[in-house]
Amino acid sequence: MRSLDAARDTCERLHPGLIKALEELPLLEREAEGSPVLDIFRAHGGAGLLVPSAYGGHGADALDAVRVTRALGACSPSLAAAATMHNFTAAMLFALTDRVIPPTDEQKKLLARVAPEGMLLASGWAEGRTQQDILNPSVKATPVDDGFILNGSKKPCSLSRSMDILTASVILPDETGQQSLAVPLIMADSPGISVHPFWESPVLAGSQSNEVRLKDVHVPEKLIIRGTPDDPGRLDDLQTATFVWFELLITSAYVGAASALTELVMERDRGSVTDRAALGIQLESAVGLTEGVARAVRDGVFGEEAVAAALTARFAVQKTLAAISDQAIELLGGIAFIKSPELAYLSSALHPLAFHPPGRTSSSPHLVEYFSGGPLEI
């Protein structure tokens, strides 16, 4: 398929050999619990996609990022979901370094290791809870000498067994005593961090979405990124940008899975040409929406406009994916469905987009307010 080939070409340019290495494993092995896809991703430079070139990464723009994610989703939906968590976290952390005055030496040294060493970033935020903000604090921090003690849990937490750094959002007092959002950088091997089984579905099991618990985990002050008196709103601004990255990338991951199903229909000439054209139109409308927002972000659209565009695309695509699944499975036929468990898997793998925050119900009043000329508050 033309547009999927373009996505694969982008992935090959930025992560040479990654798709080929993944395809050496059967789909269901790629998707299973204990799958090596994250090791393969790490070995082929996957960690550096959104890391700036100054830190040894690719510094990819939004369009390249959604295309890479789509290519991964067509090959391994589990990996695409996990890669989204790493990449949107990287996008936020490295955006923060541009506005920290100055970043601590420890922060710079740690972030400079991400791309060269293939360090994977997990997020301790709310991306698995539909009706919440993705950056809703999920960890409590207690001040101690030289830092804070963190307690809490995140479930599900993708990359739980492969992460090198866990990030979280916490509410801490600033120099004036005001409560503000801060982001601690927590080494995954810190005493007090443990991983526990949580994900029981076979769908997306390869994303390692288990429970991560923090019990009396010490994080030094020098590894806490927080607001500054001369720029108190910087974290709020960056939350908006991070929100857009998350929605674009997670949508692209599921568009990739839909692309794999559609490609099978095209390759097997299933149904009439009119049927295949209708399916292709459904898919390409989802691709066009996602890539259109990515182009806008690349070209400078930001703030409320970018958030509204990303959410509009995400919810429109979410509805389209269900139609693509139904139509593709019908065209591929009952015998194919019975004989090929991969088809049932791919069809099921399109639906979890609806479970990522924010939920359509909770977002609706805010979108209506924005569509009617008011501000957008998510």
Curated annotation (Swiss-Prot):
Keywords: Antibiotic biosynthesis, FAD, Flavoprotein, FMN, Oxidoreductase. GO terms for biological process: antibiotic biosynthetic process. The keyword Flavoprotein applies. It holds the Pfam family Acyl-CoA_dh_N. Exists in dimeric or trimeric form depending upon buffer conditions. It can form an isobutylamine N-hydroxylase two component enzyme system formed of a flavin reductase component (VlmR) and a monooxygenase component (VlmH). Involved in the biosynthesis of the azoxy antibiotic valanimycin, which has an antitumor activity. Catalyzes the oxidation of isobutylamine to isobutylhydroxylamine via the formation of a flavin 4a-hydroperoxide. Unlike other known N-hydroxylases, isobutylamine N-hydroxylase cannot carry out the reduction of the flavin cofactor and requires the NADPH-flavin oxidoreductase VlmR. Also able to oxidize propan-1-amine, butan-1-amine, butan-2-amine and benzylamine. It has a similar activity with either FMNH(2) or FADH(2). This is Isobutylamine N-hydroxylase.
